[in-house]
Amino acid sequence: MSIIGRNDDSLARARSAIEVNVAAFVDRGLTSEDEAATLLDRITTGTDYNAAGKEDFVIEAVPAQRDLQIEVFGRLDTICDADIVVASTSGQPISLMVNRISYPERAVAMHFVYPAQLMPLVEVCGGPQTLPEVVTWACDFLTSIGRTPALMNKDVDGFIVNRLQFAVLREAWSMRANGIASAEAIDNSFKMTLGRLYSDTGPIESAELGGLDILHTFAEFLFPAIDDSKTPPEALTELVRAGNHDLKSGKGIYGWAERDGQA
């Protein structure tokens, strides 16, 4: 397997991250040291795009910036054979990224969910021009490496996982902004109930286990009260503008330096 990066520094960081994750698997008894060494030996790195022309399958993993992804696909188009499969790891529709390639029928989205080394599911979505056999190949390939493909029927923004996740995030931020509950109460409520429930049954399965008649009755009552905003919440916008982004910046809703959980 070849990893092609923009520069040596980014490749060094990528290699280091892979080694750390593989070492964690060894430490937990999920693989042996010999298997880990064999895996790492199979990975080569470089900055020469032409190396992609030697592969049967190329997948982009650049930041989710559409212009950059389109540029990468355009460069690959000048290098790769017409029968190669090209894929995007983005949760954005593949149809929005193929305007600079001459074989859009060979392009497919394969969205690995972060952290990819732990999450077994990969969303697979072809565009309007993608050949059915390319989508089938992508699913078969993922199955062969121990992943579970989630095949989508339509090329839509966000795919399955992000659409579900952002529905939850929108309501969570709305409840905090409206003073319904603290961030800690909201997070604990999810972790200690839905987080555990949905690890065994999905939302549609859970609804059928509880009864669709009950779901329908409660939906009539609750749906009108749930947030349906079309823009990010103001509280989130203010945090981003202030530079209080996340764990890396040390502060968001939570003060990560002390992690007191009071919000």
Protein language model features and the residues they cover:
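Generic structural signal for residues in well-ordered beta-strands
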Residues: 1, 43-45, 107, 149
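A general alpha-helix detector
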Residues: 21, 120-121, 168-172, 203, ...
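NAD(P)-dependent Rossmann-like dehydrogenase/reductase catalytic/cofactor-binding core
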Residues: 133, 143, 147-150, 178, ...
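Rossmann-like NAD(P)-binding element
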Residues: 9, 24-85, 92-95
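Structural/interface elements that position substrates and couple domains in central-metabolism enzymes
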Residues: 2, 144, 161, 165-171, ...
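NAD(P)+-binding Rossmann beta1-loop-alpha1 motif at the extreme N-terminus of oxidoreductases
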Residues: 1-24, 28
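Rossmann-fold dinucleotide-binding core
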Residues: 86-154, 158-162
